[in-house]
Amino acid sequence: MSYHETLSFHTLQHVNKPKYAVFCDFDETYFAHSITDESRKALMDLETFIHSHHLDHKILLGWVTGSSLSSVLAKMKRGGFRYLPHFVAGDLGTEITYFSEEGQVSDKDWEARLQESNFSHDLVEEIKQTLSEKYEIALVPQTQHGFSRYKINYYYRSSDESTDKRALEAIRRLAREHGIGVNINRCNPLAGDPENSYDVDFIPLRTGKPYIVDFILDKFAIERENSFAFGDSGNDVDMLKKTGHGYLVGNATAEAKSLHSRMTEGSYTAGILEVLKAHIKR
């Protein structure tokens, strides 16, 4: 995503020594794919709150998402967004980009962590071939996401419960044996995924959504008790558990609800706003 592409959005001002950190999943959490008048108003209300109070309350806002930066930007345009967050941790938290009036910049420390990993497309292809030839497990490429250096996406088509359990265990075991991280969760058709499928995302070890929380809190010296996270799906739960206040939004998936009990009353940005208003003080 080039700098000129972000010029249609406002940036939040730099927060000196932030007190609070707010981590939000993007698809079906901050951004409702089924755009309605109600969801537009809820988004505007949250944006207004963040813009009005991020300086006096010292709030650092970030989106932690499986989507790429270019995909996030396209959805922002479609959804009528006005403001970029302070940072986007895109491609499932394998890259961090900060936004300010001066432009955008990648986090070099995070990039160095990725470069130190042994992640490679060849290793992932080797895992995929072994799954196919030895276990007859087919992974279908998610071609709509394009190319990413540090994240490779597949779908696993669900069968029956016992078959799925064996297949997912095999995927996790092979990833572990190859020194590669893997994120697996049920697809959400509301976010454009197919029915009866799992997302299978290969990423470097020590990256992904929960590691973004640890990294940002440490980098900005923010107390964990002053951190908030919001999500809607199973792949958000580990991120929620890393913060002092982790919530599923009201429209969360059944899988996510079975894994995490703390929920907002409202859906999407309405749920985020209700929590921030209740907890964030000067």
Enumerate the predicted regions with their spans:
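Non-catalytic pre-domain segments flanking phosphatase-related domains
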Residues: 1-26, 30-34, 45-52
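Active-site phosphate-binding/coordination module
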Residues: 3-6, 41-142
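Mg2+-dependent phosphoryl-transfer enzymes with acidic/Ser/Thr/Gly-rich catalytic loops
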Residues: 4, 17, 203-282
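The start of beta-strands in P-loop NTPase/AAA+ ATPase cores
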Residues: 20-22, 86, 227
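Short loop/turn segments at strand-loop or loop-helix junctions that form parts
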Residues: 22-29, 91-93, 146, 155-157
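Glycine-rich phosphate-binding "P-loop"
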Residues: 30-38, 200-204
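Short, surface-exposed amphipathic charged segments that create phosphate/polyanion-binding patches used
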Residues: 99-110, 198-201, 278-282
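Conserved acidic, metal-coordinating active-site core of Asp-based
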Residues: 130-228, 235-238, 242
